[in-house]
UniProtKB/Swiss-Prot annotation:
Homodimer. Coiled coil: none annotated. It catalyses: (S)-4-amino-5-oxopentanoate = 5-aminolevulinate. Pathway: Porphyrin-containing compound metabolism; protoporphyrin-IX biosynthesis; 5-aminolevulinate from L-glutamyl-tRNA(Glu): step 2/2. The modification N6-(pyridoxal phosphate)lysine is found at K265. The keyword Isomerase applies. This is Glutamate-1-semialdehyde 2,1-aminomutase. It holds the Pfam family Aminotran_3. The gene is hemL.
Length: 426
């Protein structure tokens, strides 16, 4: 029995499902999850000492690679001054200044502890600001595990086959209207049915929780126009795409200005951090200055702020996103060529530093219905073949992959060669 197998057996007796977040359990691919001992650069090292080229990146935060010295040193330095104060710090102000500088649509920002907290709080704020109850989200998109958002969710909810989670009261879910991603007609129909009741749209600008599905050219601008027409707020959930697709996020890449933006993952450099922010007049409705309540004991934690500030400072260096995009392009092109050489039908979607693999005969994958028609069983086999080759992909056909600046030509070439051998065995 490997150490991972032994640890998993112990964990299953102590932790529900043996993991602290469902997708880690390998339910989407079968087998025993890897238990990780350490990570550095582009590599993970499991409890048995085996190294893997990592394309999960802690589900997105590790854009600089694992254990980056600037972030590590910032955390050590901050920890020497104390772990948590429950009071404001200078680093919170510096972090807020940096975030609002890098993301120009954010006049003000509030720090929280996770992406779920960010989206949950942004929706509460939108409802409070507009005095409306209903929200629009999109089929296959995931915005955290708040009750109002677990309605036809993506991510682990798709992997588990439970797009509507038990425990979500029908009275909560009835205020969440689910539309089709990349389909403006479905959104207009929702607004026309409830013209004075919809507080906001929340959208992943690149749907990264049904693998990786970029927006069609007119989709995000169309959402902006509909929100303006019906006096609703547009919330762009950049928890995954923020600082990864472009420095100012996917909203800058696609040229769309939201009313509110949600951030997470990269903003913490590997520490638990989320944030939401946007137009000043909307943000000023938050407590303590306004009536919409939001709070958190560990929000703005000094260790997390130090890690995030160090990470964003590095990410903001010139050329970062051009390099990240070029590395992702090389990987995508290589995987497509390898699949074609072995007559394996494959679609690779990619934008910035994220990508998705779809085993399908379709010419493109642009919405949830396309995603669920892909060959999940073939992905499962491919995942384990690649794992045996020392390449760690997301353990679910419904999760995006992530490139980091620590990935070099050697890692990309190894991945492409491993894929060619794996495709040959499918």
């Amino acid at each position: 029995m490997s150490k991972s197998e032994n640890l998993y057996a112990q964990a299953q007796q102590l932790i529900p499902g043996g993991v602290n977040s469902p997708v880690r359990a390998f339910n989407g691919v079968g087998g025993v999850p890897l238990f990780i001992e350490r990570a550095n650069g582009a590599y993970l090292y499991d409890a048995d000492g085996k190294a893997y080229i990592d394309y999960v990146g802690s589900w997105g935060p590790m854009v600089l690679g694992h254990n980056h010295p600037a972030i590590r040193n910032a955390v050590i330095d901050a920890a020497e001054r104390g772990l948590s104060f429950g009071a404001p710090t200078e680093m919170e102000v510096k972090m807020a200044a940096l975030v609002t500088e890098l993301v120009p649509t954010m006049d003000m920002v509030r720090m929280v502890n996770s992406g779920t907290e960010a989206t949950m709080s942004a929706i509460r704020l939108a409802r409070g600001f507009t005095h409306r109850d209903k929200i629009i989200k999109f089929e296959g998109c995931y915005h955290g595990h708040a009750d109002c958002l677990l309605v036809k969710a993506g991510s682990g909810a798709l992997t588990l086959g439970q797009p509507n989670s038990p425990g979500v009261p029908a009275d909560f879910a009835k205020h969440t209207l689910t539309c089709t991603y990349n389909d403006l007609a479905s959104v207009r129909a929702a607004f026309e049915q409830y013209p004075q009741e919809i507080a906001c749209i929340i959208v992943e600008p690149v749907a990264g929780n049904m693998n990786c599905v970029p927006p069609l050219p007119d989709f995000l601008p169309g959402l902006r126009a509909l929100c303006d027409e019906f006096d609703a707020l547009l919330i762009i959930d950049e928890v995954m795409t923020g600082f990864r697709v472009a420095l100012a996020g996917a909203q800058a890449h696609y040229g769309v200005e939201p009313d509110l933006t949600c951030l997470g993952k990269i903003i913490g450099g590997g520490m638990p951090v989320g944030a939401f922010g946007g137009r000043r007049e909307v943000m000023e409705a938050l407590a303590p200055g306004g009536p919409v309540y939001q709070a958190g004991t560990l929000s703005g934690n000094p260790i997390a702020m130090a890690a995030g500030f160090a990470c964003l400072t590095e990410v903001a260096q010139p050329g970062t996103h051009a390099t990240l995009t070029e590395l992702t392009n090389q990987l995508a092109d290589g995987l497509l060529a390898a699949a074609k050489a072995e007559n394996i039908p494959l679609v690779v979607n990619h934008v910035g530093g994220m990508f998705g693999l779809f085993f399908t005969d379709a010419a493109s994958v642009t919405r949830y219905a396309d995603v669920i028609r892909c060959d999940v069983e073939r992905f499962k086999r491919f995942f384990h073949l690649m794992l045996a080759e020392g390449v760690y992909l997301a353990p679910s056909a419904f999760e995006a992959g992530f490139m980091s600046l620590a990935h070099g030509q050697a890692e990309i070439q190894h991945t492409i060669d491993a894929a060619r051998r794996s495709f040959a065995k499918l």
